[in-house]
Amino acid sequence: MRSSLAPAIRLMQSVSRDSCYRGFIIVMTFLFYTCYHMSRKPISIVKGQLHRNCSALPSPPNISANDTTWCSWAPFENSNYKELLGSLDTAFLVSYAIGMFFSGIFGERLPLRYYLSGGMIICGIFTSFMGLGYYWNIHALWYYILFQILNGLAQTTGWPSVVTCMGNWFGKGKRGFIMGIWNSHTAVGNILGSLIAGAFVSTAWGLSFIVPGIIIAAFGIFCFFFLVEYPEDVGCTPPQQPEDTKENLEDMPVSYNSTDTICKSTESNEDDSGNAHTETEHPQAISFFGALRIPGVVEFSLCLLFAKLVSYTFLYWLPLYIANDAQFDPKAAGDLSTLFDVGGIIGGILAGGISDYTGKSAITCTIMLILTAPMLFIYNYLGQTGVSTTVAMLIVCGILVNGPYSLITTAVSADLGTHESLQGNAKALSTVTAIIDGSGSIGAALGPSLAGVLSSRGWNYVFYMLIAADICACLLLVRLVYKEIRTLCGGMRKSYTEM
């Protein structure tokens, strides 16, 4: 007697080929950008080891008992260590911000698979060189600043590439919720980076950089062999291409000018026999200033500048703040800081789901930003009063801080990059993503740098800066919120009239 088909095989047969490939792309791009964030996290964990209070440790025989910095790593052993550590953050984030504006342009003009895989391998090399400074006993500040700059430039290859790849494979339906789940790679990468770096920080902090560097380079090789840029390359159906959509695209007029092609419509040509045939040209890549003219790009870019300032200040300085304020060792502080990223996962999914349900991205971001300001104030005064309080406050702050940041960098960027004014030109996606994330990266560079200066005067000043930045982010969305409220009220009046 022959048995029925195995359940797993029946399940595989029930899943379409398109769904399999799309699931594969989601998992791949998730893992790739997880590696990017994992490789940039170790510096925040290692900070607590580069400068330590050595008075509580037994000193070697040749060290004076009055020397409280003998266990620190030069040149970070002096009282200006916060400024020096801040300069490492600034070097990385400024180069990242500058490089991001050009990365989207290159990403649209180079093969995506080569660009992404090459960037990941280079990131792995530069990250590892930071750790090799430990084994080569390098104490020159310029060495660490140099590789922070190079790594910052290499890291810009990641975000525009993975967002463009996702945009090539997925349409707009439930984009906020899907992107909210997918964007948890940021928090997952931060958590993995913290745990991996924390495992080595107290014994050999060089491995805190080298191990993540090897991992991202290995995934870069995997990317080269397996990434599929477009559904058409493997015979899958491209997103948003039902018959009615195709007909609508054929009816769209040409929309371009002499300096900036937004879209090229379908053209009809005649062959030698006189028969007309339709030929769809590939749309040209949009220019930088053309992308800025897309409605909403400027507002969300400036909003992200301040939102990312807050998020990245937590990313780079939270472990040190916990270690100094609550007297945890570097490993425990790094482990505890991952709770902020856990909250970030929840916040990204929550913001995406609310945005999908309401269709109001600006209102969703603004409400979460409004709630963030008082929560930061409360955390500053109550956050370290007990372990349970710290855990709760870190998760809540992670939800509110990273929710808007996640929504803007994923679903909002993808929506603006495929805005109706572009008339189907998907070439704008990488450039729009790079503009929005590049603007945010300016804030990401400013936040940790200012925190390095202000923290020497007291952590209160750092939190005042974060609250001010959060308020600025809210104000920059006022015009878009007003438009969304008018649309919402208009829809309610229409429904009331129809009743």
Curated annotation (Swiss-Prot):
Instruction: Note whether Transmembrane helix occurs among the keywords.
Output: yes
Lipid biosynthesis listed as a keyword: no
Q: Where are the transmembrane segments?
A: 21-40, 86-106, 116-136, 138-158, 187-207, 208-228, 302-322, 334-354, 362-382, 391-411, 434-454, 458-478
Give any Gene Ontology cellular component: endoplasmic reticulum membrane
Concerning Pfam families, the annotation shows: MFS_1
Q: Which CDD domains has this protein been placed in?
A: MFS_SLC37A1_2 (cd17344)
- One Gene Ontology term from the biological process aspect of the record: glucose-6-phosphate transport
- Where on this protein are sugars attached? N53, N62, N66
> What is the membrane topology noted in the UniProt record heading this document?
Multi-pass membrane protein
What is a GO molecular function of this protein?
A: glucose 6-phosphate:phosphate antiporter activity
Q: Which reaction does it catalyse?
A: D-glucose 6-phosphate(in) + phosphate(out) = D-glucose 6-phosphate(out) + phosphate(in)
Which family does the entry's similarity section mention?
Answer: Belongs to the major facilitator superfamily. Organophosphate:Pi antiporter (OPA) (TC 2.A.1.4) family.
Chain's role: Inorganic phosphate and glucose-6-phosphate antiporter. May transport cytoplasmic glucose-6-phosphate into the lumen of the endoplasmic reticulum and translocate inorganic phosphate into the opposite direction.
Entries under PANTHER family matching the protein:
GLUCOSE-6-PHOSPHATE EXCHANGER SLC37A2, MAJOR FACILITATOR SUPERFAMILY TRANSPORTER 16, ISOFORM B
Query: Can you say what this protein is called?
Result: Glucose-6-phosphate exchanger SLC37A2
- Species this chain originates from: Xenopus tropicalis (Western clawed frog)
